[in-house]
Amino acid sequence: MYFFVTTAKALITADDETWMNLYLNTDGDSKTGWEGYDFILNRSRTDKTVSIERFVDGKWQFEKVGEAEYALCENGLMLAVSKTLIGGESGKALSLTFKWADHADIRGDIMRFMELGDTAPNDRFAFAYNASGLTDERTAEPGTETGTGAE
């Protein structure tokens, strides 16, 4: 799956844990993970990859489960995430909700999304992605025989 965010101004890269985080709720259950989010991406990064971490025991604690490749341009960031690392199955649709947060040093307090950093969407809202009506070809992993590269 690909996630892409654009910014109004040029991105200024930072090496801290709060730079351009992506929060994912992949099981559709608001009672699992931290405040419903099962994963946080990009708390750490290398030149080519960002971390994928699972929230542990519903707390602001993390367990690294893998990495995602990323690409950065002047005012955009794209993450290429394997569905199998975030609870999905290759070839099957995965519906989820997601939220981008930049420099939102929330430290486990979801209410701080309202006052710290930039978030999209704002406050406690999240974007919803529903792939339930897509065919197997449209939900395959990038680079596979049936993958279109447009997941």
Give each language-model segment a name.
Residues M1-K9, L77-K83:
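Short, well-ordered beta-strand segments enriched in hydrophobic/aromatic residues
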Residues W19-D47, E74, L85-G149:
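Acidic/polar low-complexity flexible segments
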Residues V65-Y70:
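Beta-strand-rich interaction surfaces with strong enrichment in secreted/lumenal proteins
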Residues M1, A150-E151:
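Accessible peptide chain termini
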